[in-house]
C-alpha cells in the first residue's frame, strides 16, 4: 500500500506535467515572435482574438494579446488536472478547524479576483504600475509573466476544485 506522501507526490508530478504541457503553446508564440515578428500565423490568430479582453503591452500587442488569450485556457487545464488526481490527493499535515474555515472562505474570494483580472479585465501593462511597466518592454520578461499567470490560474483552479474534497476527508478523519 502506498503512503499519503507517495500519493501526493504522484499527484504533484501530474500537476507539473500538465503545467509544462500547458506552457508549450506560450513558448511556440514566443519562438514565432522572435524568429518572425511579422508572422502571418501570429497576425491571423491576433485578428481572431483581438476583441477579447486581455492583458497586453503596447510594445508587442500581437504576442501579448495571443498569450493573454491563451491563458484563458488555464482553468480548463486545472479541471483536467483535478479529474486526473482527485482520488490520490490526501491531507498530510494536521490542520485546525479554523484553517479549514479560512481556506473555504478566502480561497474562493481570492480565486474570483484572480479570474476576473486575468480572464475578463482589459489591462495595458505599459500604463500599469512600476513593476508591470518594467516587464512590458521585453518579450522574454513578458513570456515569464504570462507563464506565471498561466501556472497561477491553473494551480488555483485545481486548488479550488480540490478544496471541498479535502474538507470532506478532513471531517471524515476527525470522526
UniProtKB/Swiss-Prot annotation:
Transmembrane segments: 14-32, 104-121, 149-168
Localization per Swiss-Prot or TrEMBL: Cell inner membrane
One GO BP: bacteriocin immunity
Keyword Cell inner membrane: yes
GO cellular component: plasma membrane
Ligase listed as a keyword: no
GO MF entries: toxic substance binding
UniProt name for this protein: Colicin-B immunity protein
Source lineage: Bacteria, Pseudomonadati, Pseudomonadota, Gammaproteobacteria, Enterobacterales
Organism: Escherichia coli
Membrane topology per record: Multi-pass membrane protein
InterPro entries associated with the record: Colicin_im
Major localisation: membrane
Domain of life: Bacteria
Function text: This protein is able to protect a cell, which harbors the plasmid ColB encoding colicin B, against colicin B.
Amino acid at each position: 500500500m502506498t503512503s499519503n506522501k507517495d500519493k501526493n507526490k504522484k499527484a504533484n508530478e501530474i500537476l507539473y506535467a500538465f503545467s509544462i504541457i500547458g506552457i508549450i503553446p506560450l513558448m511556440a508564440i514566443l519562438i514565432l515572435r522572435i524568429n518572425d515578428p511579422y508572422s502571418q500565423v501570429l497576425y491571423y490568430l491576433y485578428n481572431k482574438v483581438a476583441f477579447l479582453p486581455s492583458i497586453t503591452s503596447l510594445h508587442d500587442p500581437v504576442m501579448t494579446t495571443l498569450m493573454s488569450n491563451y491563458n484563458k485556457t488555464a482553468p480548463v487545464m486545472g479541471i483536467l488536472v483535478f479529474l486526473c488526481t482527485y482520488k490520490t490527493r490526501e491531507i498530510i499535515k494536521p490542520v485546525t478547524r479554523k484553517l479549514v474555515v479560512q481556506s473555504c472562505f478566502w480561497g474562493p474570494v481570492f480565486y474570483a479576483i484572480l479570474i476576473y483580472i486575468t480572464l475578463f479585465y482589459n489591462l495595458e501593462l505599459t500604463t500599469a504600475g512600476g513593476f508591470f511597466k518594467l516587464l512590458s518592454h521585453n518579450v522574454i520578461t513578458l513570456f515569464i509573466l504570462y507563464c506565471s499567470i498561466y501556472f497561477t490560474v491553473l494551480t488555483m483552479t485545481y486548488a479550488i476544485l480540490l478544496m471541498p474534497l479535502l474538507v470532506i476527508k478532513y471531517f471524515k478523519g476527525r470522526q
